[in-house]
A protein has these predicted regions:
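Binuclear metal-ion centers of metallo-dependent hydrolases, dominated by the metallo-beta-lactamase
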Residues: 1-3, 73-88, 139, 162, ...
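Core dinuclear metal-dependent hydrolase active-site scaffold
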Residues: 1-29, 79-142, 156, 204-208
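Short, Asp-centered acidic motifs that coordinate Mg2+ and/or phosphate
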Residues: 17-18, 33, 145, 172
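Active-site metal-binding motif and surrounding structural segment of the metallo-beta-lactamase
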Residues: 23-68, 142-147
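Short, acidic/turn-prone active-site loops that include or flank metal/cofactor-
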Residues: 24-25, 39-41, 64-66, 83-87, ...
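Active-site regions of enzymes building and remodeling cell-envelope glycoconjugates
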Residues: 31-38, 74-82, 94, 144, ...
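Redox-cofactor binding/interface segments in oxidoreductases and associated redox assembly factors
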Residues: 35-36, 96-100, 148, 175
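Metallo-beta-lactamase
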Residues: 118-184
Length: 208
């Protein structure tokens, strides 16, 4: 259904191939859709996007990506800019963008209008959080699978993420965004130990 190669780089292979924040992937040109949460280098990597892009690929993200997407050869009708707290229809998909920002850190400011995504993929509702702190306004997101950053420094840390997830109550949580820039296997272990037993903790990638 999905795999995460590193950081927050997700690939869904269902009836279409959907990427979120792809980085460090070799040439394959198989993307139907590429969703971007924000333009930082570990989420929006030009080389990888060019490796995934084909003539039919559509790219979706905050307004910051628009000019770069044009430079990469996307036509205007294959670029979709989105905002938090809005719901969108794209082809046969419906998705909501939710806020992703830091409360007391300068790395991801609220006014940047960067985002996470809530989307049904192959009958399962996913929340892909992006780089964010544990926001009160996101605690009531309804999803079956939550993909949550736990690395700290630039996002919520393992303890904050566990508290957030326990309030959200998805069926499954996939902690990610650790092991590349910040965060270690110890953060995964701490997170897993603090998540309610009713929620399944699924590894994003191999031990870091």
């Amino acid at each position: 259904m999905f795999d995460i190669n590193i950081q927050s780089s997700i690939r869904f292979d269902v009836d279409k191939v959907i990427y979120f924040d792809p980085i460090k992937l070799d040439e394959r040109h198989d993307a139907d859709y590429i969703f971007i949460t924000h333009p930082h280098y570990d989420h929006f990597e030009k080389e990888t996007i060019l490796n995934l892009k084909n003539d039919y690929t559509k790219i979706i993200g905050p307004k910051d990506i628009y000019e770069v997407a044009l430079e990469m050869g996307f036509s205007e009708d294959r670029i979709m800019t989105v905002m938090p707290n809005e719901t969108y229809d794209l082809d046969d998909m419906n998705f909501k963008c939710v806020p992703a920002y830091n409360i007391d850190k300068p790395y991801h400011l609220k006014e940047y209008n960067w985002i996470g995504y809530v989307m049904e993929i192959a009958g399962i509702i996913y929340y892909i959080a992006g780089d964010t702190d544990a926001l009160l306004e996101n605690e009531d997101i309804i999803c079956e699978v939550a993909m949550i950053p736990i690395g700290g420094t630039y996002t919520m840390n393992a303890r904050e993420a566990a508290t957030f997830v326990n309030k959200m109550k998805p069926k499954v949580v996939v902690p990610y965004h650790y092991g590349m820039v910040v965060g270690t296997e110890d953060d995964f272990k701490l997170f897993a130990s603090l998540v309610d037993s009713s929620i399944t903790v699924q590894r994003a990638y191999e031990k870091k």
